[in-house]
A protein has these predicted regions:
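Short functional hotspots where side chains directly engage DNA or cofactors
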Residues: 52-57, 106, 132, 143, ...
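Exposed loop/turn and edge beta-strand positions of beta-sandwich/beta-sheet ligand-binding modules
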Residues: 23, 51, 77, 99, ...
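C-terminal catalytic core of tyrosine-transesterase DNA break-rejoin enzymes
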Residues: 2, 28, 32-39, 121, ...
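Basic, Lys/Arg- and aromatic-enriched nucleic-acid-binding interface segment
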Residues: 1-43, 51, 97, 137
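Short basic/aromatic active-site micro-motif
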Residues: 22-24, 108-112, 129-148
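Short, contiguous acidic/charged loop-to-helix segments that flank catalytic cores in large enzymes
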Residues: 15-18, 68-78, 104-110, 127-135
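Active-site/catalytic core of tyrosine-dependent DNA strand-transfer enzymes
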Residues: 2-8, 60, 84-129
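Conserved tyrosine-mediated DNA breakage-rejoining catalytic core shared by Y-recombinases
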Residues: 5, 42-93
Length: 168
């Protein structure tokens, strides 16, 4: 299940990006990058390269087993993801005073059900279909493919080991 471009834009407009790291910020990052939930949780300020407008995906957060950094899902999951300038501007303010090696979003016990219910509320607020955080990953991929980006490029961006996964 995924949103179209108009639905996504409406939902993103409902996010509250004032203040420090929050579920709304994580939702924005997943929507704009297609990261897996565990990859987004594993992000630290030092993973963001503002000069090159990239995000380095090199670890995940083990939210299912009480937390801590663990390796990515597979070797292909280690990657650099290009960020758009608007997201770079937004994130530079968010990250500037945070400790460089600490997770931005993983504080204490983390449940994906919490992130999913926050996202569901935003979807309902603007009258778009309710999707999960993983659905945002599908949304990101679908919009790229619809815009004419090759399956190979989308596959690399998502960290898939095989293009077959992307096509499914």
């Amino acid at each position: 299940k995924y949103l179209n471009q108009f639905e996504l834009h409406a939902m993103l407009g409902d996010l509250d990006l004032s203040g420090g790291p929050s579920w709304d910020w994580l939702i924005l990052i997943v929507a704009k990058t297609g990261l897996r939930f565990s990859e987004a949780l594993g992000l630290t300020p030092e993973d963001f390269d503002f000069a090159h407008q990239t995000l380095s995906v090199n670890k995940t957060w083990d939210y299912k087993n009480g937390g801590g950094f663990i390796p990515t899902k597979n070797a292909s999951s280690v990657r650099k993801v290009q960020l758009d300038w608007q997201l770079i501007m937004q994130l530079s303010g968010l990250l500037k005073d945070l400790p460089p090696t600490e997770p931005v979003f993983a504080k204490g016990k983390v449940y994906n059900s919490t992130a999913n219910s926050v996202l569901a509320r935003h979807c309902q607020n603007v009258g778009v279909p309710t999707i999960s955080v993983h659905g945002l990953r599908h949304t990101h991929a679908s919009l790229l493919l619809f815009a004419g980006v090759s399956i190979a490029s989308v596959s690399r961006r998502l960290g898939h080991a095989s293009m077959t996964t992307t096509q499914e």
